[in-house]
Amino acid sequence: MSADAPEPGPGQSPGERASGGPEPSGVDLARVALRAAREAARARGDAAQQKKQARRGGLRSGARADGRDPMALGSAINRLITERGWETPAAVGGVMGRWPEIVGADVAKHCVPERYDEDERVLVVRCDSTAWATNLRLLAPTLVARLNEDLGHGSVRMIKVLGPGGPGGPGRRYGPLRAPGSQGPGDTYG
């Protein structure tokens, strides 16, 4: 180097001058970026940690329990339900599966839960006759109290009871057995 040429600064190759030499491009640009990344990693201490892990053979579990240890399937599902906030929908799904135990076998033969609206906290139940629908409407306050005791306070606010020919139901609207001008679904009253 000549005496009048300034020394290259940090991050500059010997061919570059501080007085506005050519910008790095191509392979030189990649080298500059790699050098900057290495310096940043060294400052963070990542390289030392990676070397330790490489010597040990990767991450290992110690003597104490951590989040990576195996767990029972039931525990894993309960953890997933809790993390995602699915407690109420999962509990209501369990209630729909245990419906005969909750309301009794006689009522369960004639009244079936259809769906649960989580936003309004309403359980929709369809009955196979208007008599059973009326019976379930009379039992609704007691049933809501029992469900909230089982699921947690406020899980079910109301039970909506549908008769046999309600919206979306199997009621007959036309056909040879349908009397002109009749209004009911062919049930006990209508």
Curated annotation (Swiss-Prot):
Record field: compositional bias (Basic and acidic residues): 36-45
Domain of life, source organism: Bacteria
Start-end of Low complexity biased regions: 26-35
Gly residues bias spans: 163-172
A Pfam family of this chain: DciA
InterPro entries xref list: DciA-like, UPF0232_actinobac
Positions in coiled-coil regions: none
Region span, Disordered: 1-70, 163-190
PANTHER family, alphabetized: UPF0232 PROTEIN SCO3875
Family listed: Belongs to the UPF0232 family.
The protein's name in its UniProt record: UPF0232 protein SCO3875
Organism placement in taxonomy: Bacteria, Bacillati, Actinomycetota, Actinomycetes, Kitasatosporales
